[in-house]
Amino acid sequence: MTYWLCITTQENWEIIKEKNVWGVPERHKNAISRVKPGDLLLIYVKQRGVGKEIEGPKVVAVYEAVSEVFRDSSRIFKSPPEMGNEAFPLRVRLRPVKIFEEPVDFKKLIPDLKFIENKRKWTGHLMGKAMREIPEEDFKLITSSSK
């Protein structure tokens, strides 16, 4: 079993919840092609501005992959402006394992996460990625911090 951190926006998190599917752009084919049924995916929602407030990055749920990767170009996901008209066509069907009552504050965990080697420039470990594999101990740390 492999553990994944899937990086998305608040808008696309709502779609993941509704449709039980994860999708990435074509350029992330190498990462998603390694996802297998039974793998566990943590959904990480990026930081965003809400009015004058900043809502920090958070982990909101655990899902299990229940399909192989498949291609579907239907436009269910919202493409951020910087990505143009992206359809996120490479997809995996999901089964919810746990949707956290309260999202996990990702920044608080950075000092203890093994996959983040540079704690001061931690965003570099996520920037430009749709998903990344994480060690089991990081998966357990994140999920044990949830409610």
From Swiss-Prot:
Question: Its domain of life?
Answer: Archaea
Query: Coiled-coil ranges per the record?
Result: none
Pfam families in alphabetical order: EVE
**CDD domains assigned:** EVE-like
NCBIfam families cross-referenced by the UniProt entry: PRK00809.1 (NF002008)
Family, according to the entry, reads as follows: Belongs to the UPF0310 family.
Q: Which PANTHER family match?
A: UPF0310 PROTEIN MJECL36
**Under what name is this protein listed?**
UPF0310 protein Kcr_0474
- This chain's source organism reads Korarchaeum cryptofilum (strain OPF8)
The beginning of the lineage is: Archaea, Thermoproteota, Candidatus Korarchaeia, Candidatus Korarchaeales, Candidatus Korarchaeaceae
